[in-house]
From Swiss-Prot:
GO terms for biological process: transcription by RNA polymerase II; transcription by RNA polymerase III. Binds DNA as monomer. Belongs to the TFIID complex together with the TBP-associated factors (TAFs). Part of a TFIID-containing RNA polymerase II pre-initiation complex that is composed of TBP and at least GTF2A1, GTF2A2, GTF2E1, GTF2E2, GTF2F1, GTF2H2, GTF2H3, GTF2H4, GTF2H5, GTF2B, TCEA1, ERCC2, ERCC3, TAF1, TAF2, TAF3, TAF4, TAF5, TAF6, TAF7, TAF8, TAF9, TAF10, TAF11, TAF12 and TAF13. Component of the transcription factor SL1/TIF-IB complex, composed of TBP and at least TAF1A, TAF1B, TAF1C and TAF1D. Association of TBP to form either TFIID or SL1/TIF-IB appears to be mutually exclusive. This is TATA-box-binding protein. Residues 1-21, 106-138 are annotated as: Disordered. PANTHER family: TATA-BOX BINDING PROTEIN (PTHR10126). HAMAP family: TATA_bind_prot_arch. Belongs to the TBP family.
Amino acid sequence: MDQNNSLPPYAQGLASPQGAMTPGIPIFSPMMPYGTGLTPQPIQNTNSLSILEEQQREQQQQQQQQQQQQQQAVATAAASVQQSTSQQSTQGASGQTPQLFHSQTLTTAPLPGTTPLYPSPMTPMTPITPATPASESSGIVPQLQNIVSTVNLGCKLDLKTIALRARNAEYNPKRFAAVIMRIREPRTTALIFSSGKMVCTGAKSEEQSRLAARKYARVVQKLGFPAKFLDFKIQNMVGSCDVKFPIRLEGLVLTHQQFSSYEPELFPGLIYRMIKPRIVLLIFVSGKVVLTGAKVRAEIYEAFENIYPILKGFRKTT
């Protein structure tokens, strides 16, 4: 009897040399699902391509959504800028000074990456004039405190003779090369030079200044000089007033740097140089205002009406 025939059927393949590579029972391998024998069978996954396509589609959809959101944000910013610009033009047409705040400064260009759409709070603000109604009137009239006028007497003068013979006259050529003369009515002071020029100061009105200059010329005539009254002219007018509220000078000088200077260590007042009319104002924290440099009274009043809305915008609220 053959030895191979005595073996069970499932072991006959293993016992024969030819059957060593031909197993008698199916062999399961994790690398070969349900393969028979030792011949490798390729693994086929029909769902792998569809999964990759779905992932690519999802990524494309997400990118499209992000682009749409950025476009919507840019469009919203542009609309806000257009609306603020129209509001400012409307305010300018109504006589108001347009305002500019941080929330109205927007970026309309396409923004890459994580660039913020709105500026940071540290963005510097453009200096502007505080907005107040143009029709608002202060109701305050500056009072004239001093008027400086000049006149030409038209002749050479001997200052020593004038100082010796005239009343209320003093002359010290080492200190000042002019005779200083004073009268009581109107209460003024005159500086008389040897060239015949005279400066009159201290008058409270134009009429008082002219009257005082004529009185000084008459005194010189009585001393024997052929004095005349030529080329009378007001050179400077000084006025003052009180706005009745304290003023933030630090904020005023920051927003009007090209017109003002403020050095509290040197002088307690803010110096404001107005362009039109050409007036210099001294503004104090207490609310007192001094106006100088005017040739006519109307310039004093006009300058104060121009500066009053600005001062009201910097009123202290404490």
